């Protein structure tokens, strides 16, 4: 029972990471060319990258 559960957890982790990476890319594409939000781009990417690392 342990091995399938672990595989399921790993699969979920990969799915969540892919989802967060997609959000990160979307934020990058949306805000990168907006002069108002440009200063916050670095903070957004750092925030989402730290989220990905925490999971």
UniProtKB/Swiss-Prot annotation:
Q: Which cellular compartments is it found in?
A: Membrane
Chief subcellular location equals: membrane
GO CC, alphabetical: membrane
Could you name the domain of life of the organism this protein comes from?
Answer: Viruses
What are the TM regions of this chain, as residue ranges?
27-47
**UniProt topology in membrane:** Single-pass membrane protein
Cite the entry's keywords alphabetically. Membrane, Transmembrane, Transmembrane helix
Q: What is this protein called?
A: Uncharacterized protein 065R
Q: From what organism does this protein derive?
A: Invertebrate iridescent virus 6 (IIV-6)
């Amino acid at each position: 029972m342990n091995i399938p559960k672990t595989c399921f957890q790993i699969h979920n982790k990969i799915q969540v990471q892919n989802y967060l990476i997609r959000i990160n890319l979307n934020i990058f594409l949306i805000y990168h060319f907006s002069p108002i939000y440009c200063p916050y781009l670095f903070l957004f990417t750092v925030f989402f990258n730290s989220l990905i690392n925490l999971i």
